[in-house]
């Protein structure tokens, strides 16, 4: 399994993939965090769906990580795309057959690939957290947001909690991408269906009837990153999100073990 992890990591650390993915993650992280502070007095809102996040919220102990928590859903979508592409392209390029010759254990291959991609995702999460918190501190003075509580013991506790929540959310998004890659065996199909569902279909359903968002998988995973929301509790999102991911992973694993490797 160690060899599978290193083999997968060798592909993940290619400059075109690693730097490109990191660039996308930092772009959305910087954009979300910057808007949060520069538009703090805007009547159009400074957060998702036009919500207003005021100084009284950002001045709390967890204010330094608020921007990072807000971008967790977008980081998750990036992870979904990477996991889906790395999984499905084994079928597209026919490399899975070669892997099985050297390592016949399909479960070992699957777990090894998942571990390597989890490490990749966690690195992105940590870097994004550092950038977001740094930007928040730099922009706090301009936005007239007090940072007195940010770096106290309570503040560091909130940072750690947010980091854990975002990491869980991003890895869950990634596993969803891996499941789609195993089911569809096509990078384009897996990515397009995953992104289309999370960004468009769920929002359309939510616009028609907001209660639908209480049960949509993408909504649950995004809420996990945010530590809960006014509409969905953290425990509800974590329980339901974990259930979706677990069921999908079991189905995809069974199919991966039993299906022919040909695309």
How does the language model describe each region?
Residues 1-27:
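Aromatic- and glycine-rich beta-strand/loop motifs that create alpha-glucan
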Residues 11, 88, 99-101, 177, ...:
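Helix-capping/transition residues at the boundaries of transmembrane alpha-helices
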Residues 16-19, 107, 188-189:
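Residues that define the loop-to-transmembrane-helix transition and helix capping
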Residues 18, 22-86, 110-184, 203, ...:
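Secretory targeting signals
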Residues 21-28, 190-201, 213-220:
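Central hydrophobic cores of alpha-helical transmembrane segments
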Residues 80-102, 106-107:
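Transmembrane helix boundary and interhelical loop/hinge segments in multi-pass membrane proteins
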Residues 209-229:
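Short hydrophobic, aromatic-rich alpha-helical segments embedded in or entering the lipid bilayer
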Residues 243-263:
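Junction motif at the cytosolic side of a transmembrane helix
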